[in-house]
Amino acid sequence: MKDYQSIFFTNSFHYLRVPLTNHLSTKMKKIMLIFVLLWARWFPIIGQAVTTSPILPNSDQEITLIFDLTLAKDAKAKGLLGKTSDVYLWSGAGSTDTGDAFQFQPAGQTNFALPFEKGKMTSLGNDKWSIKLKPRDYYAVPANIPIKKLGVLLKSGDGKFQTEDFIIILYDNKLNVAFLQPKEKTFFADAGATISVLAVSSQKANLELTVNGVSVTTTVLKDSLKHTLNISTLSGASQTVKITATTATETATNEFIVTVKPTPTTAALPTGVKDGINYISDTKVTLVLFAPKKDFIYLIGDFNNWQSDNKSLMRRTPDGNRYWIDIEGLTKGTEYAFQYLVNGTLAVGDPYCEKILDPNNDRGISSTTYPNLKFLPDNVKSIASVLQTGQTNYPWKVTNFKRPAQDNLVIYEMHIRDFDKDGSYKNAIDRIAYFKNLGVNCIELMPISEFSNNDSWGYNPIYFLAPDKAYGTKDDLKKFIDLCHENGIAVVLDVVYNQADYEFPYVKMYWDGSQPSTDSPFFNQKATHPYSVFFDFNHESQATKDYVNRANEFWIKEYKVDGYRFDLAKGFTQKQSSDDGQFRLYDQGRIDILKDYYDKIRSYDKDAYVILELFSEDREEQTLTDMGMMVWANQNGDARNAVKGNGSDFSRFSYKPRGFKTPAAVGYMESHDEERIMFDALKTLNLSIALERSKAALAMFMTVPGPKMIWQFGELGYDVSIEQNGRTGRKPIRWEYFSDPERLKLYKVYSEIIKLKTSQEIFRTTDFIVDLAGVVKKMMLTNSTNKMISVANFDLAERSVASIFPSLGKWYDFFTGTELNVSDLTTKYTLKAGEFHIYTTTQLPKPEADLVPWKPLGTIIPLAVESEMEEGIKLYPNPSKDLIYVEIPAFAKGYIFLKINDVMGRLLSETEFKAGQKNYTIDIQRLPQGTYFLNAEQGEKRLVKKFVKL
């Protein structure tokens, strides 16, 4: 047969352009020209991202795979465009029609984040790539095992960019016949239209084309047949078109069905129904799909053998925006899979469904994680939704959970996949004592709604109301939330409303080749900001607002979640920006959008948390936190620098430098998105020192008033880079760390400081001072019954620190319980490198011994006081409201410096006076009320006098 091109699975239809490239040799150009001329014979039917030569490939012959990256739909494929090298095939072979297409993989194909040399692609120019392979040899499939299909994708060497998966069907060595035009097995056409038919066979044969059993044309000993087919004029009428190839010894057939586009009935929605699945009774449901600008929609599923006919044609509402249908005669408790067949060409699930079935990924979910998972029929090739009447409600044990106050939250950010061996809710349930002992009072789950594939961080959402089955059943999730509530732990969901991946029905339904169409009710054609990865929601669209509000209401009411973290909340805008400098500027439109969502959430649950990943300018965050929302406060870089002994500033762990009125900054040293502190520290420090310095960082971070967050396993000193196996790839699970004595001490220090924070009222005070910018960091908190100071030396050398304590009397070292009687506020204390302390004026229960190596403060170095400077010096009045007068001995010579410091040792003012004066006047009117120190200095001579500003 002729060297035709084969077209296989992809989700959209395009025309392929194959211009010659200047990068090819003259000989190669000639070969390509012949190839293109052969191709051009069937040019009108070409248009898929993957084609093959020959047209009907089999497993035992060499085939050429040709990729056109301009036609790939995965958003991550954009990173492959324009490349001339560093593109690789990642592929597999499957032995069954319905099983895993990656069942057999080539030797050496093990790490997606590394180049796979055997799969190195050849550039054809203009974003087209090719590779030649013989499937049976390439995938090392035994001769007695059939190869039914190939699963293929292209990726960059480091795996950061990739196409979606494509499926290539392989044929056996017998006579085969197929339609190249039309491509679809079933499709719709306008009444009275004509369509072109092109069939090819794997060898010369007698070919016959029939329509509804009636012969319309034949050829003799040819390998192709062309025909123009006249479509019926009857609405909804179907025609079965069949091609038969016959040789002296074999017969092969293939067919497609074309149906005349129907005209739907117009009818108003039944009272009380809403978009999605409406359960009317144990035997009846009403399905409603919001689908403006669509011509007709069929409901297909288990209940009608996946057939589109007049009975399954959905009614259209008078405004043309919705389609609906009643399904009756259902069996209580039975799961039914279904899809909407939109305009006769696109089958999608219900955007509001609570469960999906995915023919390409579900078989990769273990029966341990999700028992008795239903599978789709072999002929259903795309995601379907599930409905089930008469479901048994989960028996909640906790129905009136009292949430921790926002300013008292200690959040544990958690990724189910990388938390334990099976990556399931069941694993998390089994570890509840771990969370309880750690002391956290909130768990923030990285996205758990259905995302593309089974292995992901979850920021590629496709069905926003369906929990992803890769982690377990919906009741497993509910049990985990219920158990958290039993143990005083709130649960927050990380939700992704800035973008959706291609498999989201409302992306696919309004699609224009490689991007959302201009008439999409939900999506911008191009993202309005520089950080979008997939397809960008338009949050000014009412359709988007309605969908997001429904999703937020659903998770609160159905799963009793305690709130949300909005991923990339800065992206909730229609304001155009090309870089972060523009993107982060105050945006009233974004504020209005977020306020609307927040108000709706609080109408569903008056105490629900809303945390924003915003990172906009302070003025905007001030406005939103004034409304009651919280914002992420990333200090990862400073935390890593502090542990390593480099310059760092922890000041913005506090809400005060941000100008917030309330403690609404969720400070964190690590998150899913940041490099791990311990990995970075171990580049320059040994493990023992790095663990101790991590304790110091925790002490200075966690004791700042306001909500805090830690990333999973930071409490054990997790030291695997975020970039290992690709940024979002699976990471090794190190539960063995919990058995390591030194790492266990870090966990226990986390536990003690977290419990200190959540149990002591002093951490809710607004009366606190932070001095967190230097290598020695200090902080002081005060309330009516207690005072607390924390101090840490992040230098790599010993430091002497003055004015640690703000008041005289008894202070108690938290980790040793040792009492220190402070009798001189000017005392200097020596802190070793990495040493930290937490002191309180109220004695607290002492933690387990030896969690930290530091002895109580007490290595005292008295300040040098020269007798010549001391004689005759006076400071009055003391206390004072406005002015203080200082008398210095008349015989002092040179210059005298008078400095005022606060109780944290911070310099507030400095005045230089010429010696010889007897009296000096200092204005203190601008100082807040409190205790201060006047330092009189001349050369190496120094005298400190305490005074009080009224």
Regions found by a protein language model. Name each.
Residues S823-I861, G930:
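C-terminal beta-strand-rich structural cap/linker in extracellular carbohydrate-active enzymes
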Residues M1-H23, F43, P862-Y876, S880-L950:
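C-terminal outer-membrane/trafficking sorting elements
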Residues L81, S85-A143, L221, S281, ...:
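Aromatic-rich carbohydrate-binding modules that target alpha-glucans
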Residues P146-V152, A237-V241, T334-Y336, H837, ...:
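Exposed beta-strand face motif in extracellular beta-rich ectodomains
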